[in-house]
Amino acid sequence: MAAKKKVVTQIKLQCPAGKATPAPPVGPALGPHGVSAPQFVQQFNDRTKSMEPGLVVPVVVTVYSDKSFSFVLKTPPAAVLIRKACGIEKGSTNSVKQKVARLSLAQLTEIAQVKLPDMSALTLDAAKRIIAGTARSMGVEVERSL
């Protein structure tokens, strides 16, 4: 049985799906740990080519003592999915007074289903409440209170 590799560090990055490059922030984050940025970028782009190009994808890179690495893709941030669903560039600067968009219950459910694997919520309803809170803090009006 092979010996387990010793983990040196874990690096959290957010990269555009299918469009990552060794330029900052990827190269400077991986370089000090001896990880080949072009090799990571190629593997990342291969694994994210089925996703919508440019969609921000969080990734956790685990670096081992022999300078090898592995990485885990996470689901896109809730704010990114909300902005995409509403068709807006950014949230409101004053979320209480200024509403910038409206999120339907169907859109809320769809986003919650996408995010559920990476959330601490145990049920879809709990995930919908979390996503609704994020939307409200962005100045997006949620169709129905949960």
Swiss-Prot record:
The protein, known as: Large ribosomal subunit protein uL11
Function per UniProt: Forms part of the ribosomal stalk which helps the ribosome interact with GTP-bound translation factors.
PANTHER family in UniProt: 60S RIBOSOMAL PROTEIN L12 (PTHR11661), LARGE RIBOSOMAL SUBUNIT PROTEIN UL11M (PTHR11661:SF1)
Endpoints of the signal sequence: none
SUPFAM superfamilies linked: Ribosomal L11/L12e N-terminal domain, Ribosomal protein L11, C-terminal domain
Post-translational modification: One or more lysine residues are methylated.
GO biological process: translation
InterPro entries: Ribosomal_uL11, Ribosomal_uL11_bac-typ, Ribosomal_uL11_C, Ribosomal_uL11_C_sf, Ribosomal_uL11_CS, Ribosomal_uL11_N, Ribosomal_uL11_N_sf
Organism: Treponema pallidum (strain Nichols)
UniProt keyword terms in alphabetical order: Methylation, Ribonucleoprotein, Ribosomal protein, RNA-binding, rRNA-binding
A GO CC term attached to the entry: cytosolic large ribosomal subunit
PROSITE patterns per the UniProt record, alphabetical: RIBOSOMAL_L11
Keyword rRNA-binding: yes
